[in-house]
């Protein structure tokens, strides 16, 4: 009898849906924690995606470890791996807040009074959440990339310098390519995460442990990150300030064409390993923190 009452209380708790403002706050906090942990890998990923093969066939970085070593040695130690973190965190707050909260919002709207949500509704919710996030966060994503790459030329650009150089209009350079990356990513990620979470949840109590949430986040992140890597490469190249010997791109299609012509199709998957290594723990940690906060809200209301 007591056990049944506890189960019913747990079910009622899990049915409590936090309001949008609460999910926005939870998403922001979760994003800051997750992003700070994996930022050095994001830095290395950007460097690897941007580097070109020289005329003699040599590369500045021979993989992830080599990039870590050279940045630490030549660019101010470990601190060099955190260049762009300030602008990244400024962008992460609205990015994760909007992406996570709006995904839950659209899921709730699609689901209505039903006890389940259809797969296409999960896919659509993720895509719409991705669109909302990109419009708000593209400027900070662009600034972060410019700051991460600036050390290559010897001069390290500051946040103020990058923003002054780009101007308001320039801060939205590459928005189309960012949408091309983030909308499919969100569609894949949230649909896989939602399905896995549902299948691993105890159907009697509605409970799911944090390790299982972490597993869902890591698995969904790995798949979504791998599939969307070509779009991430194109976005990075469009948004990075070109050097004297770098090609100039007229748009997404032109960047695809020139990249494949000069470096082959493999170039579209540059940085795929660090990208997966970033996205997997980032979204795993972020979703765990996010779900903890949602659970806390439910237990106090």
Curated annotation (Swiss-Prot):
Superkingdom of the source?
Eukaryota
Q: What is the lineage of its organism?
A: Eukaryota, Amoebozoa, Evosea, Eumycetozoa, Dictyostelia
Which gene specifies this protein's sequence?
Answer: mcfX
Its placement in the membrane is given as: Multi-pass membrane protein
What is this protein's function? Mitochondrial solute carriers shuttle metabolites, nucleotides, and cofactors through the mitochondrial inner membrane.
Which key words tag this protein in UniProt? Answer: Membrane, Mitochondrion, Mitochondrion inner membrane, Repeat, Transmembrane, Transmembrane helix, Transport
State what protein this is by name: Mitochondrial substrate carrier family protein X
Checking PANTHER family in the record gives: MITOCHONDRIAL 2-OXODICARBOXYLATE CARRIER 1-RELATED, MITOCHONDRIAL SUBSTRATE CARRIER FAMILY PROTEIN X
* UniProt xrefs under SUPFAM superfamilies: Mitochondrial carrier
Which family does the record claim for this protein?
A: Belongs to the mitochondrial carrier (TC 2.A.29) family.
What does the UniProt entry say about where the protein is found? Answer: Mitochondrion inner membrane
- Please give one Gene Ontology molecular function term for this protein: transmembrane transporter activity
- Identify the stretches annotated as Solcar repeats: 18-109, 117-199, 208-296
Secreted among the record's keywords? no
Q: Which GO terms describe its cellular component?
A: mitochondrial inner membrane
Q: Which residue intervals are topologically Mitochondrial intermembrane?
A: 1-23, 98-122, 195-207, 293-301
Which stretches are Mitochondrial matrix in the membrane topology?
45-75, 144-173, 229-271
Please give the start and end residues of each transmembrane region. Answer: 24-44, 76-97, 123-143, 174-194, 208-228, 272-292
